[in-house]
Regions:
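N-terminal beta1-alpha1 ligand-phosphate binding loop
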Residues: 1-31
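Conserved RecA-like P-loop NTPase ATPase core
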Residues: 5, 73, 107, 140
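Short hydrophobic segments within beta-strands
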Residues: 6-8, 42, 105
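Short glycine-rich anion-binding loops that position phosphate/pyrophosphate groups of nucleotides
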Residues: 11, 77-80, 108-111
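Conserved strand-to-helix beginnings and helix N-cap segments that scaffold or border functional pockets
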Residues: 17, 84-88, 117, 137
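S-adenosyl-L-methionine/SAH cofactor-binding core of RNA-modifying enzymes
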Residues: 35-102
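A mid-sequence interfacial segment
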Residues: 87-127
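Structured adenosyl-cofactor binding patch, chiefly the S-adenosyl-L-methionine
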Residues: 114-160
Length: 160
């Protein structure tokens, strides 16, 4: 199953970008024997439209165009919270059901277009708090890596 991340906004060169790259590189290595591949990031420009609603609509179009056909997971503070093990198991279920691709969506400063959130196969929350897109990208990359280690029995995850 090919995993992609579509994120509004570009990360500048620096420690945050390096951390995302490091976690996704590890996820690629650990995920390959599990048939979890890709771990691509599509950085999409923030819309310059005049209103928040118009910006979200434009950004949603760019997100849909960037992601391969497949499942969509929108990251939103109003979404469902999952423990790391439950997240890993959900990825495995989708893979075992024969899903070819999954795209994770990280919105911009205005959030994600409500129509895209409603159409998503899952709306996932890391917290009811709002986080900067750079931190969400780091947290998602880490959780994807953690999921691959949980599924492979690697000792990285030491949860209860």
């Amino acid at each position: 199953m090919r995993i992609s991340i579509a994120a509004i906004g570009r990360m500048k060169t620096g420690p945050e970008r390096e951390l995302v790259a490091r976690y996704l590189e590890r996820a690629q290595g650990a995920g390959k024997p599990l048939a979890l591949t890709g771990f691509d990031v599509f950085e999409l420009s923030e819309s310059r439209a005049g209103s928040a609603a118009a910006r979200k609509t434009e950004e949603a179009k760019a997100i849909r165009a960037a992601l391969p056909d497949g499942l969509v997971v929108a990251l939103d503070e109003r979404g469902k919270s999952l423990a790391s093990e439950a997240f890993a198991n959900q990825l495995a279920r989708w893979r075992d059901d024969g899903r070819a691709a999954i795209g994770f969506v990280i919105g911009g400063a205005d959030g994600i277009d409500p129509d895209l959130v409603r159409a998503a196969d899952l709306t996932l929350s890391f917290s009811p708090m709002v986080w900067p897109h750079q931190l969400v990208r780091i947290m998602l990359a880490e959780q994807l890596y953690r999921a691959t280690t949980i599924l492979s029995g690697h000792p990285y995850h030491r949860g209860d």
